[in-house]
C-alpha cells in the first residue's frame, strides 16, 4: 500500500478540548495536502472545517454523544441533525456503554438507530463501542447491534478512555460484522506498523492525530 492509498483510509483527528481555530486551520491544511479521508473534529468546529474543505475530496467528520456516550438518544439525534446542517459528512457516535453492560440491548439498538435515522443517509454513521471497557462478549454484542441498527461502521475507541485500538479487537469486530461493514481503528495508532497491523486484521478506516507520522513512516508520541 502506497502513501496515497494509506492516507485515504485515515480520519485526520483533533478532538482535544483546547483545539483552537489555528489548530483546525492547520488540520484542514494538512488534510488537503495529504488527501486524507476526512478531518475528525468536535461539533463546534464543523462549520469552519466545512468552509475550509469546500470543493475538496476531504470529508468533515464529527463526534456525537462524545466521549462518554451517556447523553439521551434524543440529544444524540439532535446533535446529528445539527452537525449535518452545519456541514458534517460523517458522524462518529458513542454507544450507551452502561446500558450495554446492563444487557439492555433494545435501548442500545434504539440509541444507535436514533443517530442512523437522524443522519437519514446524508452522512456516514460510525458507532464507537469503546472496546477497552468491554468484555469479548460485549464487543461482539455491540457490533451486532450497530449492524442491526443500520450503521455504516463500527469503531473501537474514543481515544479518551483507558485504551485504544488493538489488532485483536479489530479482528473480532471484522469477524462479527462481516465483509460489508466498515471497521474503524482509533486510539493508539501512531506508526505505519500500527496502521498495517490493524488494516491486516480488517480495518478499513483509521482515526489518528499522528496521521502525517504514519504516512511518512515515522512514530508519533500522540496519545490519540
From Swiss-Prot:
Recorded GO CC terms: cytoplasm
Subcellular location: Cytoplasm
Catalytic activity: 2-deoxy-D-ribose 5-phosphate = D-glyceraldehyde 3-phosphate + acetaldehyde
Pathway annotation from the record: Carbohydrate degradation; 2-deoxy-D-ribose 1-phosphate degradation; D-glyceraldehyde 3-phosphate and acetaldehyde from 2-deoxy-alpha-D-ribose 1-phosphate: step 2/2
Major enzyme class: lyase
Task performed by this protein: Catalyzes a reversible aldol reaction between acetaldehyde and D-glyceraldehyde 3-phosphate to generate 2-deoxy-D-ribose 5-phosphate.
Protein name per its UniProtKB record: Deoxyribose-phosphate aldolase
Source organism per UniProt: Clostridium perfringens (strain SM101 / Type A)
Lineage start: Bacteria, Bacillati, Bacillota, Clostridia, Eubacteriales
Gene name of the record: deoC
Amino acid at each position: 500500500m502506497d502513501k496515497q492509498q494509506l492516507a485515504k483510509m485515515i480520519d485526520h483527528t483533533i478532538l482535544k478540548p483546547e483545539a483552537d481555530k489555528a489548530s483546525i486551520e492547520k488540520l484542514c491544511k494538512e488534510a488537503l495536502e495529504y488527501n486524507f479521508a476526512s478531518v475528525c473534529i468536535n461539533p463546534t468546529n464543523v462549520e469552519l472545517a466545512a468552509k475550509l474543505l469546500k470543493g475538496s475530496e476531504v470529508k468533515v467528520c464529527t463526534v456525537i454523544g462524545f466521549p462518554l456516550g451517556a447523553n439521551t438518544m434524543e440529544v444524540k439525534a439532535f446533535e446529528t441533525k445539527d452537525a449535518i446542517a452545519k456541514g458534517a459528512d460523517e458522524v462518529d457516535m458513542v454507544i450507551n456503554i452502561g446500558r450495554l453492560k446492563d444487557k439492555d440491548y433494545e435501548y442500545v439498538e434504539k440509541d444507535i438507530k436514533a443517530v442512523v435515522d437522524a443522519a437519514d443517509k446524508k452522512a456516514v454513521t460510525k458507532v464507537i463501542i469503546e472496546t477497552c471497557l468491554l468484555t469479548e462478549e460485549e464487543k461482539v454484542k455491540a457490533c451486532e447491534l450497530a449492524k442491526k441498527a443500520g450503521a455504516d461502521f463500527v469503531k473501537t475507541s474514543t481515544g479518551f478512555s483507558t485504551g485504544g485500538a488493538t489488532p485483536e479487537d479489530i479482528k473480532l469486530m471484522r469477524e462479527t460484522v462481516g465483509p460489508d461493514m466498515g471497521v474503524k481503528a482509533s486510539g493508539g495508532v501512531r506508526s505505519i506498523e500500527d496502521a498495517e497491523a490493524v488494516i491486516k486484521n480488517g480495518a478499513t478506516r483509521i482515526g489518528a492525530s499522528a496521521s502525517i507520522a504514519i504516512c511518512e513512516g515515522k512514530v508519533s508520541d500522540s496519545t490519540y
